């Protein structure tokens, strides 16, 4: 294939090699083998028009004949609602983060018209007016749609300028309203409209916005928060809106939405959801449910156990607190830090462990509880049905099974069993439905503590509940507190998703201080993704236009990033003529360098990991290099994939960190909501965006662990660490001792005067009102005489040539030069006579 402008060849055209059914993934329905039986066979989008050939490219293109999701002969909603694309996207398991190749093509086929119209803000507004009423899927989670709505029809938005929340974007246009399906059990008023587009819920106050480069945002009107859902079209088609925590808050979510956290007993469900205040909830948890393990479900990741805590000191049984020099002092310091951050009383709900600690047992120590099922011991590898991921009844299909590999647990060493949740998101349903749901009880005897196995489990997050009812998560990896959910029911649907997408919410200062939002990740808000290779400045020229980018994303045999992400990225780099290793190395060098704090004791050089000499260093390879992620994205990556060996690259910057000196101890139930908000806002104003000085249970490999007193204060060593870049020891010169001097009273500053002949000093002026004309001269002290300035040296002697002679010689030389050149110097002008000013005549008053 011929080269274009010295770059890599053009990708294969769309629609070739897929048979006679039309272009693959663009404007055509999926193959019949991928559509369940009973599904309608209508076209999924309005882009299935006759193919036209663009001059100069020779590429088989597809031009849409109408708005996406509807042919010219039908309404905007009916075709997609009953089409195969909706049925295909409804079978995405809740544990999966990315879409497969077929689901990716179905997602892009529906959004094709919006992508091609994303050139200017005016073009996007025209598109929203032309395709008003069209339903577009959000990919993940299933059951959520974007109903295209002009801005004039959005209630409460008004003249809101979203660029104030994202100054990097040149323009942001609100184009759609976010709606979702409704569960008839949770909302009986829906009735027969539960499976119809008219029965969708639009009461969340969420709107979809598009920016330049197809950056997708979700705007929360109630909280005035802008959430970055995707940085480009490729990320939007691959992941959808599944990382937006705000989507999972509504209690009216339908059956088709991803399932909620599976609780072992209906009684525990009632305890968590019907608690009126945190004090009563904490008392009930300590009395009845301490040590119980809950299989926590988070969208986009595997199930993981959460052990309910009976007391704060129980965290000493888990890493990284168990390996600290003094676990009790470290826990006291962390509790003091949480008091300063939350500014109110709080309750420790549980410790979230990695997924490998999730196992099955016969039940708690007292036996199998009611409402639970005990799987067989020798079950081996089990399969999981889609549960709440199945489409609604109108689709007439059931989700496929998803195999789950066996995982070790505790000392028994069985298989991790993921159980389908029949009631899906109906966490507020009846007790009978909750009791009938198949659940699994993971008892405290199986894996609640380190005594059940040879290794100590690591607490990835500590779930907290404050007086306002909000759920937070303390991350021992970096020592920060992150918001997880607005309430407990929201937490049971979203899990720890708030800690897996850090730095993607932008809000005003007051709102960010009230909700304790983390700092914005500038790497995500201001720069494109490192693996979005079609946006790289050295990419092929044909990939810089919308049609070229579309052909690149939906080319034949692009691959699937789920099974082999490295091969997927290598294929993209090879198509665009880029070197993946070079791209990763350049992006890694642009990240901020690490910082080792002054108060952090560094290990001696012989205990640190020294890099090999240059002669033994191998050439970096993309397969072995870590992804170039920012600090917040790196923490999210470690929490998502349970990287227990993760360590922070830097410590707290001592010169720029803000040290909170508040020693207040808050008790549950003693603070008003307004007082809590004012305390948080005051501290955020004093901090001014600086980094928080905090205890870090996990420290970098180059440092020792921190030391704390019994009151929770950090012990600062007398001999601090040396600078990181200094190879030589600093040397200091010994100063001679200063002899003792006799104390003298302070006197007036001396006046400097000349010594030697000179004009006599002027007599001092006579003071007003004095009768005596004689004034005595000021008396000079001995100290003043010693500090007198020495006389100036005489001017240098030039023999007979004095300054007057030199000036006369220079004047003569100037006149000679002027005479020899023929120009006579112009004589000076005579002085002008002063004009006599006439005075006005004096007025004589008679």
UniProtKB/Swiss-Prot annotation:
Major localization class: virion
Q: Which UniProt keywords apply?
A: Early protein, Host cytoplasm, Host nucleus, Host-virus interaction, Inhibition of host innate immune response by virus, Inhibition of host interferon signaling pathway by virus, Inhibition of host PKR by virus, Interferon antiviral system evasion, Transcription, Viral immunoevasion, Virion
Q: Where does the record place Low complexity bias?
A: 26-56
Asked whether the UniProt record includes Transcription among its keywords, one would answer yes
What GO biological process terms does the UniProt entry carry, in alphabetical order? bidirectional double-stranded viral DNA replication; symbiont-mediated suppression of host innate immune response; symbiont-mediated suppression of host PKR/eIFalpha signaling; symbiont-mediated suppression of host type I interferon-mediated signaling pathway
GO molecular function ontology, one term from the record: protein serine/threonine kinase inhibitor activity
Q: Biased composition, Acidic residues: where in the chain?
A: 722-732
Cross-referenced Pfam families? US22
Subcellular location(s) per record: Virion; Host cytoplasm; Host nucleus
Amino acid composition bias (Gly residues), ranges on this chain: 16-25
Keyword ATP-binding present in the record's keywords: the answer is no
What does this chain do?
Inhibits the establishment of the antiviral state in the infected cell. Prevents the phosphorylation of the host eukaryotic translation initiation factor eIF-2alpha and thus the shutoff of viral and cellular protein synthesis by directly interacting with EIF2AK2/PKR. May also participate in viral DNA replication by interacting with the DNA polymerase accessory protein and the lytic origin of replication, oriLyt.
Q: What is this protein called?
A: Protein IRS1
């Amino acid at each position: 294939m011929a080269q274009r402008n010295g770059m890599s060849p053009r990708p294969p055209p769309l629609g070739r090699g897929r048979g006679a059914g039309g272009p693959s993934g663009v404007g055509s329905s999926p193959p019949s083998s991928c559509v369940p039986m009973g599904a309608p066979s209508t076209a999924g989008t309005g882009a299935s028009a006759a193919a036209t050939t663009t001059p100069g490219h020779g590429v088989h293109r597809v031009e849409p004949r109408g708005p996406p999701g509807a042919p010219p002969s039908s309404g905007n909603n009916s075709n997609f609602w009953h089409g195969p694309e909706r049925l295909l996207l409804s079978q995405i398991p809740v544990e999966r983060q990315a879409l497969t190749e077929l689901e990716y093509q179905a997602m892009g086929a529906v959004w094709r018209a919006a992508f091609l119209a994303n050139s200017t803000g005016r073009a996007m507004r025209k598109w929203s007016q032309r395709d008003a009423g069209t339903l577009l899927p959000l990919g993940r989670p299933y059951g959520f749609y974007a109903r295209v709505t002009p801005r004039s029809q959005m209630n409460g938005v008004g003249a809101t300028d979203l660029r104030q929340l994202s100054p990097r974007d040149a323009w942001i246009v609100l184009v759609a309203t976010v709606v979702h399906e409704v569960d008839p059990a949770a909302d009986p008023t829906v009735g027969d409209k539960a499976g119809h587009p008219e029965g969708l819920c639009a009461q969340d106050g969420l709107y979809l916005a598009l920016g330049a480069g197809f950056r997708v945002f979700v705007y929360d009107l109630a909280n005035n928060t802008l959430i970055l859902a995707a940085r480009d079209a490729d990320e939007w088609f691959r992941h959808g809106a599944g990382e937006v925590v705000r989507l999972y808050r509504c209690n009216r979510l339908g059956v088709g939405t991803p399932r909620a956290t599976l609780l072992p007993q209906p009684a525990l469900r009632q305890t968590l959801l019907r608690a009126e205040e945190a004090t009563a909830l904490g008392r009930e948890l300590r009395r009845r449910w301490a040590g119980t393990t809950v299989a926590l479900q988070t969208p986009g990741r595997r199930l993981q156990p959460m052990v309910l805590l009976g007391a704060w000191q129980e965290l000493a049984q888990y890493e990284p607190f168990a390996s600290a020099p003094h676990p009790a002092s470290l826990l006291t310091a962390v509790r003091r830090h949480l008091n300063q951050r939350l500014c109110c009383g709080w309750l420790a709900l549980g410790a979230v462990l990695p997924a490998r600690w999730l196992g099955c047992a016969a039940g708690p120590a007292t036996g199998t509880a009611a409402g639970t099922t005990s799987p067989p011991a020798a079950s081996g590898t089990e399969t999981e049905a889609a549960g709440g991921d199945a489409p609604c009844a109108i689709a007439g299909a059931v989700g496929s099974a998803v195999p789950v590999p066996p995982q070790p647990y505790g000392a028994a060493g069985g298989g991790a069993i993921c159980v389908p949740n029949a009631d899906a998101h109906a966490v507020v349903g009846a007790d009978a439905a909750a009791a009938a749901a198949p659940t699994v009880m993971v008892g405290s005897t199986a894996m609640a503590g380190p005594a059940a196995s040879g290794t100590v489990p690591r607490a990835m997050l500590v779930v907290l509940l404050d007086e306002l009812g909000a759920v937070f998560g303390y991350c021992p990896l970096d020592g920060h507190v992150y918001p997880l959910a607005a309430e407990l029911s929201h937490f049971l649907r979203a899990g720890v998703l708030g800690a897996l997408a850090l730095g993607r919410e932008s809000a005003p200062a007051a709102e960010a201080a009230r909700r304790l939002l983390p700092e914005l990740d500038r790497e995500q808000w201001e720069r494109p993704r490192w693996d979005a290779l079609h946006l790289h400045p050295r990419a092929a020229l044909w990939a810089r236009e919308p049609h070229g980018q579309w052909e690149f994303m939906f080319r034949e045999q692009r691959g699937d990033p789920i099974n082999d992400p490295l091969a997927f990225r290598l294929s993209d780099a090879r198509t665009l003529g880029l070197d993946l290793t070079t791209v990763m190395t350049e992006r890694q060098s642009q990240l901020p360098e690490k910082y080792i704090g002054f108060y952090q004791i560094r290990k001696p050089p012989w205990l640190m990991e020294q890099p090999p000499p240059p002669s033994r260093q191998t050439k970096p390879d993309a397969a072995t290099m870590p992804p170039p992620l920012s600090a917040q994205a790196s923490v999210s990556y470690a929490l998502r994939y349970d990287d227990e060996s993760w360590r922070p690259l830097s410590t707290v910057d001592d010169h720029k960190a803000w040290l909170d000196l508040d020693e207040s101890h808050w008790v549950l139930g003693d603070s008003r909501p307004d007082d809590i908000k004012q305390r948080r806002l005051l501290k955020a104003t004093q901090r001014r965006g600086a980094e928080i000085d905090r205890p870090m249970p996990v420290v970098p490999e180059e440092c020792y662990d921190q030391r704390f007193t019994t009151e929770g204060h950090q012990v600062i060593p007398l001999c601090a660490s040396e600078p990181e870049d200094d190879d030589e020891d600093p040397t200091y010169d010994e100063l001679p001792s200063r002899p003792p001097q006799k104390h003298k009273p302070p006197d007036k500053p001396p006046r400097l005067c000349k010594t030697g002949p000179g004009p006599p000093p002027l007599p001092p002026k006579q003071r007003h009102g004095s009768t005596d004309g004689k004034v005595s001269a000021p008396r000079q002290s001995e100290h003043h005489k010693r500090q007198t300035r020495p006389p100036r040296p005489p001017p240098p002697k030039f023999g007979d040539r004095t300054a007057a002679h030199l000036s006369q010689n220079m004047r003569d030389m100037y006149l000679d030069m002027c005479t020899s050149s023929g120009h006579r110097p112009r004589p000076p002008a005579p002085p002008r006579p002063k004009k006599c000013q006439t005075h006005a005549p004096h007025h004589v008053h008679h």
